[in-house]
């Protein structure tokens, strides 16, 4: 699943490819992806100009002339831009045709991705309704607010970080990496964490996601950026998908368990449960 670094990388790529382009028509081959009224979606998009791109958590934002298109890639969503006629591809579901002859194509093998069209004034309310936490940056991710939220919850810390309410953008890969760096067991109840552990998780969340953005995200199976290029953050993973390998910090064998239905990687020595 694309997490914050992958979505940010896609966003930056699309900025170089489609800003300023005017949509001439829209073609939708899998209508279930569109969460706005379908007729409204098809009626409103033509004649809109893509003014800028943005991101909030794992949501990709297309700022148009007087609307915002919100796209969530879910498990396998990808965007590809073709300067002229695009090739026929099996998993292409939405086509944005531009006046200059180019086409932006949304592909999704699993068909889990979604798109919605809003007026800009409703964007903040939209994310409030999703209970989306702050961005993982020094200015937005307040340590004291984070510690207070942890103290009120019995959820395992991994599950809590994944639910997007504490901080936006973490998924299965980067939660494992953050908790390994912070030396916290993923099954620890949130309210049992010390101030030092909470601080370590806070700081490592910012550091890991920042590094992953610099590396263009992680390509584990199928992720590519808007140019079809792989990310390289997977080369810097210390624990995710390292089951049976030695922990680089202590030499103990990395283990994998199921936690909240998610495969979870950790070092049983560095990340003790008790």
UniProtKB/Swiss-Prot annotation:
One of its GO terms (biological process) is base-excision repair. It catalyses: Hydrolysis of DNA containing ring-opened 7-methylguanine residues, releasing 2,6-diamino-4-hydroxy-5-(N-methyl)formamidopyrimidine; 2'-deoxyribonucleotide-(2'-deoxyribose 5'-phosphate)-2'-deoxyribonucleotide-DNA = a 3'-end 2'-deoxyribonucleotide-(2,3-dehydro-2,3-deoxyribose 5'-phosphate)-DNA + a 5'-end 5'-phospho-2'-deoxyribonucleoside-DNA + H(+). Keywords: DNA damage, DNA repair, DNA-binding, Glycosidase, Hydrolase, Lyase, Metal-binding, Multifunctional enzyme, Zinc, Zinc-finger. Binds 1 zinc ion per subunit. A zinc finger (FPG-type) spans 238-272. DNA binds at residues 91, 110. Its cofactor is Zn(2+). SUPFAM superfamilies: Glucocorticoid receptor-like (DNA-binding domain), N-terminal domain of MutM-like DNA repair proteins, S13-like H2TH domain. Belongs to the FPG family. Involved in base excision repair of DNA damaged by oxidation or by mutagenic agents. Acts as a DNA glycosylase that recognizes and removes damaged bases. Has a preference for oxidized purines, such as 7,8-dihydro-8-oxoguanine (8-oxoG). Has AP (apurinic/apyrimidinic) lyase activity and introduces nicks in the DNA strand. Cleaves the DNA backbone by beta-delta elimination to generate a single-strand break at the site of the removed base with both 3'- and 5'-phosphates. This is Formamidopyrimidine-DNA glycosylase.
